[in-house]
């Protein structure tokens, strides 16, 4: 049926219903436009949000088009018309009125399309006229341009009048565009249709409606077909291998295979293949050296940057600016022999009494104190123990100090620890001040002490040297002002400066564990400013500074150079003498701590004593002559524990091996008791005690726990234990001599030598040595000793007796017998 045949037999009637397309897909809500290719007049099908009504409106676009645009719009029109047909076919509401309405709409648009050919000539003519007008317009003034606008609107009106829908204007008597829009909205509508509940459409329906229908077959694609198409596209994307990226790989001295693969963004399997090519079998969890890792990375096309493991400590290196330097207080270390008055001198200087609280009158660990003297000038003192066991702690004290004061008792003179203190001070290269103490005592000789100092190259200023020798009395506070003046004078000559800016750094003086407070570490700040909340690394320990306390027990928030403080927050107990630094974050601190722990472990393995071949054979046979004394050492501070361990390991013994199973800071715990029970060890506690649970476990397991408060008592007891484990010395003790005068042969007994005791005493069972012509021909034991017919235990000098030897009868008259006993003596270390 043609376009004219459908319209002419009957006129369109006006009705109350509106033209509607009952499409089931909501995503096409909005306006769909169909463009007449001849006149570019738009016919819009407007669909409400419910998808139930469609209205037609005609809008005039423009008055000049080129032929290319006309052809393109014809194709667009045909494609959209095809979509509408599909929508009608897909809908399950096959209402005849709906199909009829759609046919009417299509016929109207087809009528417009049929007149395209008749207007082509007219369009070409209009294009030529437009070009001529464009040339004329460029030559006219702005006023002439304004006159062109009504002409343009007039042409648009002419275009509208001559549009393909001119038949509709004639049929319905419409004179203007407004009336045409109104007529279409009110008259060209479909009858009302009772709609069912809209069905929820599927993705497949949407693809089918919007799919290309160039073939015109109208075939509906199934959901499985769509899925297959999607999977095919995905496979194409996967098959396209991404371009390989070559990176710069940072390789440390040792790296794991998996870590190397991650650094290169390569598969672990590829890295393992490269290792196999090099003849190395390794899995992802194993480590390889830097050279091998470099070969693998180079073979895979990456560039390599070698770094050393020690580079993690580079963040700790920083230089102070000259303009930031400020004068700081001197750090003075007090050294000397036991009980020569070091702590008493500090008491006098800082007006406190620490010596009274110390066991045995000696300092058990390093203490750091800050003393303010005249003119508000401060001096930091470090009190090192005077006992010989703390030589290592003293050496650490000398490394952090600016000035060393060596205290010598005027009535005692130079002693062993005094010489060690002099040597430590010389090795540190720091100035020395000699304080001759106890000058208040009677019958002292200061000149004798000075002469003893000359022997060790300590020459006073009065003798032309550079060492200040000051006689003092700490008890009577004599000449203390002169000592302070000497300290400040040397400090001024040294021009001691440090920067209070930047990250803090310094040295650990002492550390311990206290119940309820955790790890307590005494540190000395050497540069920068330490604040609460800073993250520090000290040796292999690290943590966040939670609290700072000064030497007077007051809580402070920051510490500047030359200020000693006690901090809380480290995860472990550091060693006395370890350096500390402030780092940016906890990760940096952890990396540095792990690196230092690995170094310490490697060093410990490298210095471990090697067993000789003979010892290995003896151990394998179970006849080892080397005995072991296992010990567990617990102390109050790390420095004391370290000093005890060092002193005990220096005890000389080739037959007893002292093995320290565990040493640490803090009270004795149940785990210590369990370890001691498993290894038959002795637990030694220095200024610490065992808890209730540990004591109960020790009594049950019969573990020996010993407490000490003075270090040399501990060392003496361990030495005695080791001495008791040594094999005793067996020595011959001569007790008498016998002269053989007559030989008797007795049946069932053998030869009996009638003898005379010429010297000492002889005992039954004693050792004998038979001499003939002063040559020893037999050595054995005395089997029989008789006097007349009676068996006796001993015969003294001047008496006769009968003797017989065990398993030996070659005796003659005139032989001499020496009698001796074997005596065991306990050995000492």
Curated annotation (Swiss-Prot):
Region spans: Disordered: 128-157
Region (G5): 473-475
Basic and acidic residues biased stretches: 128-137
Pfam families: EF-G_D2 (PF22042), GTP_EFTU (PF00009), GTP_EFTU_D2 (PF03144), IF-2 (PF11987), IF2_N (PF04760)
Keyword Cytoplasm among UniProt keywords: yes
Comp. bias (Polar residues): 140-152
Region of interest (G3), residue spans: 383-386
Gene3D superfamilies linked: P-loop containing nucleotide triphosphate hydrolases, Translation factors, Translation initiation factor IF- 2, domain 3
Recorded superkingdom: Bacteria
Binding site for GTP: 336-343, 383-387, 437-440
Domain tr-type G: 327-497
Locations listed in the record: Cytoplasm
A molecular function GO annotation: guanosine tetraphosphate binding
GO cellular component terms, A-Z: cytoplasm
Residue numbers spanned by region G1: 336-343
InterPro entries according to UniProt: EF-G-like_DII, EFTu-like_2, IF2_II, IF2_N, P-loop_NTPase, Small_GTP-bd, T_Tr_GTP-bd_dom, TF_IF2_bacterial-like
Region (G2): 361-365
Annotated region described as G4, given as residue ranges: 437-440
Keywords: Cytoplasm, GTP-binding, Initiation factor, Nucleotide-binding, Protein biosynthesis
Main location: cytoplasm
Function: One of the essential components for the initiation of protein synthesis. Protects formylmethionyl-tRNA from spontaneous hydrolysis and promotes its binding to the 30S ribosomal subunits. Also involved in the hydrolysis of GTP during the formation of the 70S ribosomal complex.
Family indicated by similarity: Belongs to the TRAFAC class translation factor GTPase superfamily. Classic translation factor GTPase family. IF-2 subfamily.
Name used for this protein in its record: Translation initiation factor IF-2
């Amino acid at each position: 049926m043609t376009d004219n045949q459908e319209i002419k037999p009957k006129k369109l009637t006006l009705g109350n219903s509106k033209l509607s397309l009952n499409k089931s897909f909501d995503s096409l809500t909005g306006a769909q436009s169909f463009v007449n290719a001849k006149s570019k007049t738009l016919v819009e099908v407007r669909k409400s949000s419910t998808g139930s009504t469609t209205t037609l409106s005609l809008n005039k676009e423009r008055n000049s088009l080129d032929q290319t645009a006309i052809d393109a719009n014809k194709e667009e029109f045909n494609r959209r018309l095809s979509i509408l047909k599909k929508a009608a076919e897909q809908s399950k509401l096959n209402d005849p009125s709906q199909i009829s309405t759609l046919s009417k709409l299509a016929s109207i648009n087809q009528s417009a399309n049929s007149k395209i050919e008749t207007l082509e000539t007219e369009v070409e003519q209009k294009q030529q006229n437009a070009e001529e007008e464009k040339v004329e317009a460029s030559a006219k003034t702005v006023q002439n341009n304004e006159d062109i606008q009504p002409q343009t609107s007039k042409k648009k009106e002419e275009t509208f009048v001559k549009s393909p829908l001119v038949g509709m204007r004639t049929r319905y008597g419409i004179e203007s565009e407004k009336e045409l829009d109104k007529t279409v909205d009110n008259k060209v509508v479909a009858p009302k249709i009772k709609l069912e509940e809209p069905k929820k459409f599927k993705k497949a329906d949407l693809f089918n409606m919007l799919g290309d229908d160039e073939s015109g077959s109208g075939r509906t694609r199934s959901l499985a077909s769509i899925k297959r198409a999607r999977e095919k596209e995905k496979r194409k994307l996967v098959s396209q291998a991404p371009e390989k990226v070559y990176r710069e790989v940072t390789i440390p001295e040792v790296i794991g295979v998996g870590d190397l693969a991650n650094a290169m963004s390569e598969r672990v399997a590829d890295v393992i293949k490269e290792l196999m090519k090099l003849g190395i079998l390794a899995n992802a969890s194993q480590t390889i050296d830097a050279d091998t890792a470099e070969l693998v990375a180079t073979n895979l096309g990456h560039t390599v940057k070698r770094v050393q493991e020690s580079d993690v400590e580079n963040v700790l290196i920083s230089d102070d600016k000259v303009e930031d330097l400020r004068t700081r207080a001197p750090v003075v270390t007090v050294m000397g022999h036991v009980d020569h008055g070091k702590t008493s001198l500090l008491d006098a200087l800082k007006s406190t009494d620490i010596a009274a609280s110390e066991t045995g009158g000696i300092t058990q660990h390093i203490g750091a104190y800050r003393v303010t003297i005249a003119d508000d000038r401060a001096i930091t003192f470090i009190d090192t123990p005077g006992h010989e066991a703390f030589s290592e702690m003293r050496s650490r004290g000398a490394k952090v100090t600016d000035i060393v004061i060596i205290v010598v008792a005027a009535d005692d003179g130079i002693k062993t620890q005094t010489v060690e203190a002099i040597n430590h001070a010389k090795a540190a290269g720091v100035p020395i001040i000699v304080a001759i103490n106890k000058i208040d005592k009677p019958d002292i000789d200061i000149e004798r002490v000075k002469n003893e100092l000359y022997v060790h190259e300590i020459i006073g200023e009065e003798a032309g040297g550079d060492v200040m020798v000051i006689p003092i009395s700490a008890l009577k506070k004599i000449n203390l002002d002169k000592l302070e003046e000497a300290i400040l004078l040397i400090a001024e000559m040294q021009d001691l400066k440090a920067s209070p800016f930047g990250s803090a750094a310094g040295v650990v003086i002492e550390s311990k564990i206290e119940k309820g407070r955790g790890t307590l570490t005494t540190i000395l700040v050497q540069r920068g400013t330490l604040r609460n909340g800073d993250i520090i690394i000290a040796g292999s320990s690290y943590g966040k500074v939670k609290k700072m306390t000064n030497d007077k027990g007051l809580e402070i928030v920051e510490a500047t150079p030359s200020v000693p403080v006690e901090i809380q927050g480290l995860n472990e107990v550091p060693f006395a003498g370890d350096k500390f630094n402030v780092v940016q974050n906890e990760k940096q601190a952890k990396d540095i701590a792990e690196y230092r722990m690995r170094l310490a472990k490697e060093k410990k393995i490298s210095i471990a004593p090697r067993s000789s071949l003979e010892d290995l054979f003896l151990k394998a046979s179970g006849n080892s002559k080397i005995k072991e004394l296992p010990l567990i050492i617990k102390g109050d501070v790390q420095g004391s524990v370290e000093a005890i361990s060092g002193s005990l390991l220096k005890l000389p013994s080739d037959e007893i091996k002292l093995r320290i199973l565990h040493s640490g800071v803090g009270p004795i715990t149940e785990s210590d008791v369990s370890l001691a029970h498993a290894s038959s060890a002795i637990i030694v506690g220095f200024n610490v005690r065992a808890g209730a649970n540990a004591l109960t476990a020790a009594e049950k397991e019969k573990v020996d726990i010993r407490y000490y408060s003075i270090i040399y008592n501990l060392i003496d007891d361990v030495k005695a234990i080791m001495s008791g484990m040594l094999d005793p010395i067996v020595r011959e003790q001569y007790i008498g001599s016998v002269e053989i005068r007559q030989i008797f042969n007795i049946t069932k007994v053998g030869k009996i030598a009638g003898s005379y005791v010429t010297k000492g005493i002889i005992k039954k069972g004693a050792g004998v040595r038979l001499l003939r012509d002063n040559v020893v021909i037999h050595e054995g034991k005395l089997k029989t000793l008789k006097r007349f017919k009676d068996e006796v235990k001993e015969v003294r000098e001047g008496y006769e007796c009968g003797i017989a030897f065990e398993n030996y009868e070659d005796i003659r008259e005139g032989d001499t017998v020496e009698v001796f006993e074997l005596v065991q003596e306990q050995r000492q270390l």
